[in-house]
A protein has these predicted regions:
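Short loop/turn segments that connect beta-strands within beta-propeller blades
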Residues: 112-117, 153-157, 197-202, 238-243, ...
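Blade-level signature of beta-propeller repeat domains, shared across WD40, Kelch, NHL, RCC1
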Residues: 293-321
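Ser/Thr-rich, Proline-interspersed low-complexity disordered segments
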Residues: 23-77
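Conserved beta-strand positions in repeat-built beta-propeller and related beta-rich domains
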Residues: 84, 99-105, 141-147, 186-190, ...
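Structural signal for beta-propeller blades
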Residues: 107-109, 147-150, 192-194, 233-235, ...
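A short beta-strand motif characteristic of beta-propeller blades
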Residues: 77-83, 117-122, 158-168, 202-208, ...
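An edge-strand/N-cap motif at the start of beta-rich repeat modules
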Residues: 61-101, 106, 315-321
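Beta-rich, blade/repeat-based domains predominating
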Residues: 83-96, 124-138, 167-183, 210-224, ...
Length: 321
């Protein structure tokens, strides 16, 4: 039997070489780098028997080991980092520890450095909102006024269209976005869905639908997503099989983040506050009150909170550790 298998293998090899020679040299074609305007739509596959665990790479400098953090301080000190913004909105943390700030009124992106300096990065945008860094260090910007995503190369200082979203409603356009370590997560605000867009903008997959106005997303250390549903007055947990679970009710939640210990921080426009759901108890505690139209919220490199107090035109640091 073995010698017959050997003769068959040799014959197949000769046939393959003759065919390959007749066809000429094989030259692979590189995939296009520009996002398709008619992207591939991949359906959500729900599998009740699924047992595998989704474990993407964590975003840069956003998930912190619990062993390195002091206990959560529920009476935190608040530090004003910068003032005199027009309408600061969303935030993203860069790998060097600097914070990037979008200003929807000014149409700008600014950088707040660890040394406390403000640098203008971009201007002339149409109501910029959420931002996310790709692994190559370039920046994706959600432009609410045009309901599209833009790509900015910080080295060449080149701004190009990345992905055009669809809005056939009278609702405001896209708000927050997130890089989850593998793809862009886009709460499709006007349409009440959550989208997953590939790093090159070539494919898009709908992860969830039926939300009122999703505006913020965060990757938990478990690999699930937290979604702030602003007009739905709730925060949901989105599992990778498409299931949605309500985490809590809030008054106009605009953004949400969570630490590695499982504490969930929600910024709310309805009562101008930061709420925290204490890990293991689901107890809702008002961490900060008396704000004015709070918007973006992220962690800094030390695990403390950075937030925009938009109505007071300032950037704040909340010392929770």
């Amino acid at each position: 039997m073995k010698w017959m298998q050997a003769r068959i293998s040799v014959a197949f090899l000769i046939l393959f070489i003759m065919t390959f020679s007749a066809c000429g040299t094989f030259a692979p074609t590189a995939p296009p780098l520009i996002a398709s305007r008619t992207p591939t739509i991949l359906p959500v596959i729900v599998s009740p028997q699924r047992t595998e665990t989704f474990t993407p790479l964590p975003p840069t400098a956003t998930i912190f080991p619990t062993s390195t953090l002091a206990p959560l301080n529920l009476n935190p000190q608040i530090i004003v980092l910068a003032e005199n913004f027009s309408e600061p909105d969303d935030l993203v943390l860069a790998a060097d520890g600097s914070v990037y700030i979008s200003d929807v009124t000014e149409g700008t992106i600014q950088q707040y450095t660890p040394a406390g300096q403000l640098n203008l990065i971009l201007s002339g945008l149409s109501s910029p909102e959420g931002m996310a860094f790709l692994p190559d260090g370039s920046l994706i910007i959600a432009e609410q006024g045009t309901n599209r995503l833009l790509h900015y190369d910080l080295n060449s200082k080149t701004l190009t269209p990345f992905f055009d979203l669809v809005n056939n409603t009278n609702n405001l356009g896209v708000d927050g976005i997130l890089w989850d370590g593998a793809n862009l997560i886009v709460p499709d605000s006007p349409n009440g869905t959550v989208l997953e867009i590939s790093a090159q903008g070539q494919t898009v997959r709908q992860l969830a639908s039926g939300l009122a106005r999703p505006t913020g997303a965060w990757l938990e250390s478990t690999g699930n997503l937290l979604i702030a549903d602003e007009n739905g007055n709730a925060v949901f947990r989105l599992y990778r099989d498409g299931a949605l679970e309500k985490v809590g009710d809030f008054s106009i939640p605009d953004d949400v983040v969570a630490d590695a210990a499982g504490n969930i921080f929600v910024i709310t426009l309805g009562d101008d506050a930061i709420h925290v759901l204490i890990a293991g108890t689901n107890q809702d505690v008002i961490l900060v009150s008396g704000l004015n139209d709070p918007q973006g919220i992220i962690f800094d490199t030390e695990g403390n909170l950075i937030m925009t107090d938009s109505g007071n035109h300032r950037l704040l640091k909340v010392l929770i550790h």
